[in-house]
């Protein structure tokens, strides 16, 4: 059991509930998870064709979230194209030039909550990177910073909603993961 990635979370939670004698609590959580997954899926059901592109950066600068990472799994449900998925690694290192050449529609940075730096400060650091002023995501004000704890594990339904709202703000308006 890892209770880590969204695509295996429901199974892992049910198994954990069985192991601990907490089947009812596990089932309540699975209903909660599926409620949010189904809501996002229904809001995005009419989206076809090309998907919005996203560069998703992990905790370190230019450490992308690639193929089969937690974000990549959520991206499939949220109908976005993870630009780093084609690089063949889960967490590939990329360069500023690569990000600029890919010109993502959305930038999402996962960050940890630390008292010395706010999420707004992390966002400002991204906005002021050399050359990033040319990116569509920056020009269109579609740069987001998200607590990384919302991408993996039991909190990931909230991360799914945030990601879907970042990729498809019109279709997901009115949905709040709070």
Feature annotation, model-predicted:
Residues 64-91:
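Alpha-helical, coiled-coil/dimerization segments enriched in small aliphatic residues
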Residues 1-63, 84-86, 141-178:
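Extracytoplasmic substrate-binding proteins
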Residues 1-19, 85, 92-134:
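Acidic/His-rich segments in extracytoplasmic proteins that coordinate ligands and/or metal ions
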Residues 66-68, 118-121, 156:
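Short, well-ordered secondary-structure micro-motifs
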Residues 135, 139-141:
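A short helix->loop->beta-strand "cap" motif at the edges of active sites that frequently abuts
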Residues 57, 72-77, 92-93, 117-128, ...:
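Conserved N-terminal glycine/acidic-rich loop preference
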Residues 45-48, 64, 74-76, 97-102:
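Short, conserved, surface-exposed binding loops centered on an aromatic residue
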Residues 14, 72-73, 97, 161:
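Active-site phosphate/pyrophosphate- and oxyanion-stabilizing loops and adjacent acidic/basic residues
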């Amino acid at each position: 059991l890892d209770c880590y990635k969204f695509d295996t979370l429901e199974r892992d939670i049910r198994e954990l509930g069985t192991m601990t004698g907490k089947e009812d609590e596990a089932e309540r959580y699975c209903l909660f998870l599926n409620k949010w997954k189904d809501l996002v899926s229904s809001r995005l059901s009419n989206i076809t064709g090309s998907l919005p592109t996203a560069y998703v950066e992990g905790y370190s600068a230019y450490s992308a979230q690639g193929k089969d990472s937690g974000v990549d799994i959520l991206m499939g449900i949220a109908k976005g194209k993870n630009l780093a998925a084609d690089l063949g690694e889960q967490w590939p290192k990329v360069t500023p030039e690569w990000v600029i050449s890919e010109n993502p529609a959305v930038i999402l940075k996962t960050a940890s909550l630390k008292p010395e730096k706010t999420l707004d400060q992390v966002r400002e650091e991204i906005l002021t990177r050399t050359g990033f002023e040319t990116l569509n995501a920056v020009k269109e004000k579609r740069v987001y910073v998200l607590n990384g704890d919302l991408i993996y594990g039991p909190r990931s339904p909230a991360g799914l909603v945030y990601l879907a709202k970042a990729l498809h703000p019109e279709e997901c308006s009115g949905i709040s993961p709070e």
